[in-house]
UniProtKB/Swiss-Prot annotation:
Purpose: Catalyzes the oxidation of 5,10-methylenetetrahydrofolate to 5,10-methenyltetrahydrofolate and then the hydrolysis of 5,10-methenyltetrahydrofolate to 10-formyltetrahydrofolate.
Name of the protein in question: Bifunctional protein FolD
Database matches in Pfam families: THF_DHG_CYH, THF_DHG_CYH_C
Record keyword Hydrolase present: yes
Organism field: Clostridium botulinum (strain Loch Maree / Type A3)
Keyword Disulfide bond tagged: no
Primary gene name: folD
PANTHER family with a match to the protein in the record: C-1-TETRAHYDROFOLATE SYNTHASE, CYTOPLASMIC, C-1-TETRAHYDROFOLATE SYNTHASE, CYTOPLASMIC-RELATED
UniProt-listed Gene3D superfamilies: Leucine Dehydrogenase, chain A, domain 1, NAD(P)-binding Rossmann-like Domain
Any one GO BP annotation for this protein: methionine biosynthetic process
Phylogenetic placement of the source organism: Bacteria, Bacillati, Bacillota, Clostridia, Eubacteriales
Length: 282
């Protein structure tokens, strides 16, 4: 039976520290504030937005939501971004992805002020990670993976890590981050041939495919540590990861659950980044 790596325990520890830091900012009359930019009304985006706002309220972090039409002109979006960049009371900016197809993703990401880029979307902030500099903002989901492993005293040095995702949101930045911790990395994706033969040799497997219960026990060995990043919702609203949790937990050494796993840490790290930005800009 695997050890369950609960992310909510990690999140609670981070929040305890944030409470102290937010209290010190309040003494200086500084209230951390996040601006959320959402284009359209996709149910997943609205659910994520509500979760962020709820978590911010618990820590006395202010939020400001900009609800935008999906057909917003790029010029109008950039004007709004410039205004938020110049607002002293706004410390962090988060733009929900994916963007409408008519918007240039690189231009949008590059428009976020570097010191307010709390989910590391700006190419220059990402570039720092690819150069091995982990001192600035990191993408929240890859950082959540690192924080969970750190909390449970799982050393990355010398480990063979397989990441099943090659996106700029998870797979590519995470690969650079674990390299900085002296791990050996393999990135897999939808075109990878014989995926189980690769994952079975790994010490740690991180999956972010987005297909519920796709990954079964034959993908792992008895010493595998499994980090399931995905959150998939079935027709009844129940949450599942990529990994068939009930099937796999009987075989592997350790595994994150869904829910109460990576997602809870991801949201908490977003809050941490807002507080980081408020402290740096004060």
């Amino acid at each position: 039976m695997a050890k369950i790596l609960y992310g909510n325990e990690v999140a609670l520890k981070i929040k305890e520290d944030l409470n102290l830091r937010i209290g010190k900012l309040k003494e200086k009359n500084i209230i951390p504030k996040l601006a959320i930019l959402r284009m359209g009304n996709k149910p997943d985006d609205i659910a994520y937005e509500r979760s962020i706002i709820k978590n911010c309220e618990k820590l006395n972090i202010e939020t400001k939501v900009e609800e935008l039409n999906e057909d917003i002109l790029e010029e109008d979006f950039l004007k709004l971004m410039e205004s938020l960049n110049n607002e002293k009371e706004t410390h962090g900016i988060l733009v929900f992805r994916p963007y409408p197809k008519h918007l240039n993703e690189n231009i949008i990401n590059s428009s976020i002020a570097l010191n307010k880029d709390v989910d590391c979307m700006h190419p220059l902030n990402l570039e720092r990670i690819f150069e091995g500099d982990l001192n600035g903002f990191m993408p929240c989901t890859p950082e959540a993976v690192i924080e969970i492993l750190k909390y449970y005293d799982i050393d990355l040095k010398g480990k063979n890590i397989v990441i099943i995702n090659r996106s700029m949101v998870v797979g590519k930045p995470l690969s650079m981050m674990v390299l900085s911790h002296n791990a050996t990395v393999t990135i897999c994706h939808s075109k990878t041939i014989d995926l189980p033969s690769i994952t079975k040799k790994a010490d740690i497997v991180v999956t972010a495919i987005g297909k519920a219960k796709l990954i079964k026990e034959e993908y792992f060995n008895e010493n595998s540590i499994v980090i399931d990043v995905s959150i998939n919702v079935d027709e009844n609203g129940k949450l599942y990861g990529d990994v068939d949790f009930e099937n796999v937990k009987e075989k592997v050494r350790a595994i994150t659950p869904v829910p109460k796993g990576v997602g809870s840490v991801t949201t908490t790290l977003l809050l941490k980044h807002i507080v980081d930005a408020a402290e740096r800009n004060s």
